[in-house]
From Swiss-Prot:
Protein name: 8-amino-7-oxononanoate synthase
Alphabetical keyword list: Acyltransferase, Biotin biosynthesis, Pyridoxal phosphate, Transferase
Top-level lineage group: Bacteria
InterPro entries noted in UniProt: Aminotrans_II_pyridoxalP_BS (IPR001917), Aminotransferase_I/II_large (IPR004839), AON_synthase_class-II (IPR050087), PyrdxlP-dep_Trfase (IPR015424), PyrdxlP-dep_Trfase_major (IPR015421), PyrdxlP-dep_Trfase_small (IPR015422)
Binding sites annotated in the UniProt record for substrate: 22, 29, 134, 339
Residues reported in the UniProt entry to bind pyridoxal 5'-phosphate: 109-110, 182, 207-210, 227-230
N6-(pyridoxal phosphate)lysine modification, residue list: 230
Short name of any one Pfam family annotated for the protein: Aminotran_1_2
Gene3D superfamilies documented for this protein: Aspartate Aminotransferase, domain 1, Type I PLP-dependent aspartate aminotransferase-like (Major domain)
Organism taxonomic ancestry: Bacteria, Pseudomonadati, Pseudomonadota, Alphaproteobacteria, Hyphomicrobiales
EC number(s) per entry: 2.3.1.47
GO biological process: biotin biosynthetic process
């Protein structure tokens, strides 16, 4: 057997050969859309801070006050001593915002999805998820022990066909999808999906990580999870559902039970960001408007969310364009397999209320020149 280092080196060499090796790049984020890498000042179009709230003075002040009064960390699982008052207040706010009976805060969006599905499904059950669902939805589905199947991306007809064929042979059934897909920026036909799931006696879990605060119109699912780290500018995850479901998660979602509670500063920051989000509808409308300005200038399909993919194809080509954009003063990270399917490496452009029109137009001009769309 190879030594541990030899094994790791071999794997790294293979990744390097395919332009798929990941490396950390220290990045300093400033207010607005400002960023810095390798000593170069940049305008960032790769951050998920869709409403620019992570640097909002009120959000920062709320975090500072919470840390000063309740400490830097929760100190334990929420079921032991880590259930500080900010968590309950945040859960009340999230439930109200989503029109749900209750909410539960997790340590991250990944941890939420890792815990929700296994608490609801197991052996003998069926989990159907959109083929482009986020990795954490896949992880939770596989961890559940249920039979896991996919349906074609945003295809209600294929979902119905799979449920018709497989639902009779299973106990419980869950359908998993996203309101806004993180790498393509398109939106699920939730009305159709929810109707089909209900007709086959299946529960629907929607990941709203990239929708909350930006595009939230449309029907609500019985299970809606999301993150506090994007439009809300903080860190953490949550589930909004009925009170019995939330109470079940409190006892059975292992990624909740066996994890230290979210730090007071993170919870307080998210709570303050939620208040700003609800009070400033013009802030919420801006990311989508800027995304559509960008797609119009490049002749791309009209943006459906704050996320716009510019497909390139091969991983190295995407890396090269990203590097050229950085040299021109823009931070637009290349997204490569396995995050996206092979042959679909892309620039993932994320728009924020902190951007201005001149920055968007300048990026569109640079991307057009580098991708042959000029």
């Amino acid at each position: 057997m190879d030594s541990l280092d030899a094994f790791a080196t071999g794997k790294l060499d293979a990744l390097e050969a395919g332009s798929l090796r990941r490396k950390l790049v220290p990045t300093e984020r400033g207010s607005g859309a400002a960023a810095a890498r390798r000593g170069r000042a940049l305008v960032s179009f790769s951050c998920n801070d869709y409403l620019g709230l992570s640097h909002h003075p009120r959000v920062i002040a709320a975090a500072q006050a919470a840390a000063a009064s309740h400490g830097a960390g929760a100190g334990g699982s929420r079921l032991v001593t880590g259930d500080h008052p900010y968590l309950g207040a945040l859960e009340d706010g999230l439930a109200r915002h989503k029109g749900a009976e209750a909410a539960l805060v997790f340590g991250s969006g990944y941890l939420a999805n890792l815990g929700i599905t296994p608490a609801l499904a197991g052996r003998g059950d069926l989990v159907l998820l959109d083929e482009l669902s986020h990795a954490c939805m896949w992880a939770g589905a596989r961890l559940s022990g249920a039979q896991v199947m996919t349906f074609r991306h945003n295809d209600p007809g294929d979902l119905a066909a799979r449920l018709a064929e497989h639902r009779p042979h299973h106990g419980r059934a869950l359908v998993l999808t996203e309101r806004v897909f993180s790498m393509d920026g398109d939106r699920a036909p939730l009305g159709d999906i929810l109707g089909i799931a209900e007709s086959y006696d299946a529960w629907t879990l929607v990941d709203d990580a990239h929708g909350i605060g930006v595009v939230e119109d449309g029907p609500r699912a019985p299970l809606e999870m999301g993150t506090l780290s994007k439009a809300l500018g903080s860190y953490g995850g949550y589930l909004c559902a009925s009170r019995p479901v939330v109470d079940l998660m409190t006892s059975r979602a292992r990624s909740f039970v066996y994890t230290t509670g979210l730090p007071p500063a993170s919870a307080a920051a998210a709570l303050e960001a939620l208040a700003i989000l609800e009070a400033e509808p013009e802030r919420r409308a801006r990311p989508l408007a800027l995304a559509r300005r960008f797609t119009a200038r490049l002749g791309l399909p009209e943006a459906e969310s704050a996320v716009v993919p510019v497909l390139v194809g091969e991983a190295q080509a995407a890396l090269d364009i990203s590097a050229a954009l950085e040299a021109a003063g823009f931070l637009v990270v290349a997204i490569r397999p396995p995050t996206v399917p092979a042959g679909t490496a892309r620039l993932r452009v994320a728009f924020s209320a902190a951007h201005d029109e001149a920055q968007v137009d300048a990026l569109a001009e640079a991307v057009a020149a580098l991708t042959g769309r000029a």
